[in-house]
Amino acid sequence: MFVTFEGIDGSGKTAQLTAAGEFLKASGKQVVLTREPGTISCIRDYVLASDMDIRTEALLYSADRAENIAKNVIPALNAGKVVLQDRYLDSFLAYQLADNKLVETDIMRLFEFSSQGLRPDLTLLFDLTPACAQERLENRDRIERKPIDFHSKVRNIYLKLSADNTDRIRVIDASQSFSKIHQQVIYHIERKLGGTHSA
């Protein structure tokens, strides 16, 4: 099963992904944790630190995705493992569209090519206001330092995507306590896996 964790910077999705991975491993599941970008370390370092043309940025993200899907995600899924990924389709759409420089058809064309058309079985969207998220962030990278209006656009795009994809995306209120959020994460994952767990 392929589960993606989405949300604006500072929403807490990465910490929840780590906690979910530990829980599933303790439950006897084989789990692989991945992130986007991150497969090709030099690409991650470059896109998070350098100003660049929006097309260059989209292509670099896509190159990293292509490598991750081919080398990590698909082999793990074929082996029956649970893949938990930090950012994927919805982040790519939300952040690229928020810049208002690329059209959705071009973004999706890049995504389809780089992802081999692979869609998540489940997406957990950690929703938080940009003002609250900004308070949590320290040592911000290039994207995290963008104006709050940009992050508001990203959040609104995420929420629209969730409304358009209710079969796949589950929205979680990220202003709750860590333990409450964790319970909801496990509930949604186990429900998708076919198990039972009370939220």
Curated annotation (Swiss-Prot):
The reaction(s) this protein catalyses: dTMP + ATP = dTDP + ADP
Domain of life: Bacteria
Pfam families according to UniProt: Thymidylate_kin
Annotated SUPFAM superfamilies: P-loop containing nucleoside triphosphate hydrolases
Amino acids binding ATP: 7-14
Keyword Transmembrane helix: no
E.C. no: 2.7.4.9
One GO term (biological process): dUDP biosynthetic process
Gene Ontology molecular function, alphabetical: ATP binding; dTMP kinase activity
Biological role stated in the UniProt entry: Phosphorylation of dTMP to form dTDP in both de novo and salvage pathways of dTTP synthesis.
Family: Belongs to the thymidylate kinase family.
Protein name as catalogued: Thymidylate kinase
Taxon lineage: Bacteria, Bacillati, Actinomycetota, Actinomycetes, Micrococcales
Gene that this polypeptide is encoded by: tmk
